C-alpha cells in the first residue's frame, strides 16, 4: 500500500477541474480554426484550377525543383514534402532539388508547427506530382507519335509500352513547353 501525507499542500480538486476545462477549451477552439487554414488550396484542387507550377518547377535538364513552403526546424521536412511530389512525378530522386522560397502570398499559408507539415500538404503535393507526370507523359507520347494511353513514366523516363521507345524528361522538356 502507498502512504500519502495528508498535510501535503497541492492543488485542490476544484482548481484541477477549472484548469482542465480551460486547457480543453483552448484545444477545441484552436483545433476548430484549422479547417479554414487550407481552404483556398482545397477549393482550388476541387475546382481543377490548381497550378502545379507554383510548387514545382522543372528545367530543360529534367531537374525538378520542389518549392517547400514549410519551415525547416530540424526534422528536414523538406525531404518528406519533396518525396511526396517525386513519387507521383516518377522522377529519379537524383534529379530532385529542394527550394525554400520567400514568403510571397502565392505560396499560401506558410505555417509550421504541430508536426502537421506533411499532413497538411500531402494531398496537394501528390496532385502536383501526378499532374506534372501526366503532362510529361502526354508530351512524351506526342514526341514519339503514339497515344498517351500506351505510355507510362518511371525514373524520369516516358516509355511506349508497345514499341519500347523512350523519351527522358530532359528530352521532353528541352523540346516542349509544358
Regions found by a protein language model. Name each.
Residues 89-93:
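Phosphate-handling active-site elements
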Residues 9, 15-37:
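N-terminal export signals
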Residues 36-84:
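Conserved beta-alpha junction segments in alpha/beta enzyme cores
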Residues 3-4, 63-84, 94-130, 134, ...:
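Short, surface-exposed loop/turn segments at secondary-structure boundaries that line and modulate
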Residues 1-11:
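N-terminal secretory signal peptides
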Residues 55-57, 88, 143, 149-150:
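Short, surface-exposed charged micro-motifs
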Amino acid at each position: 500500500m502507498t502512504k500519502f501525507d495528508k498535510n501535503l499542500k497541492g492543488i485542490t480538486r476544484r482548481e484541477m477541474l477549472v484548469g482542465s476545462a480551460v486547457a480543453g477549451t483552448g484545444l477545441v477552439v484552436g483545433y476548430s480554426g484549422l479547417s479554414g487554414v487550407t481552404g483556398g488550396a482545397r477549393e482550388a484542387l476541387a475546382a481543377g484550377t490548381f497550378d502545379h507550377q507554383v510548387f514545382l518547377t522543372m528545367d530543360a535538364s529534367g531537374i525538378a525543383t520542389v518549392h517547400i513552403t514549410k519551415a525547416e526546424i530540424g526534422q528536414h521536412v523538406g525531404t518528406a514534402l519533396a518525396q511526396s511530389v517525386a513519387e507521383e512525378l516518377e522522377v529519379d530522386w537524383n534529379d530532385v532539388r529542394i527550394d525554400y522560397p520567400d514568403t510571397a502570398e502565392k505560396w499560401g499559408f506558410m505555417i509550421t508547427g504541430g508536426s502537421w507539415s506533411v499532413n497538411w500538404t500531402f494531398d496537394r503535393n501528390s496532385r502536383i506530382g501526378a499532374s506534372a507526370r501526366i503532362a510529361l507523359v502526354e508530351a512524351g507520347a506526342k514526341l514519339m507519335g503514339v497515344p498517351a494511353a500506351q505510355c507510362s513514366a518511371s525514373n524520369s523516363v516516358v516509355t511506349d509500352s508497345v514499341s519500347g521507345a523512350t523519351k527522358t524528361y530532359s528530352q521532353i522538356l528541352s523540346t516542349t513547353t509544358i
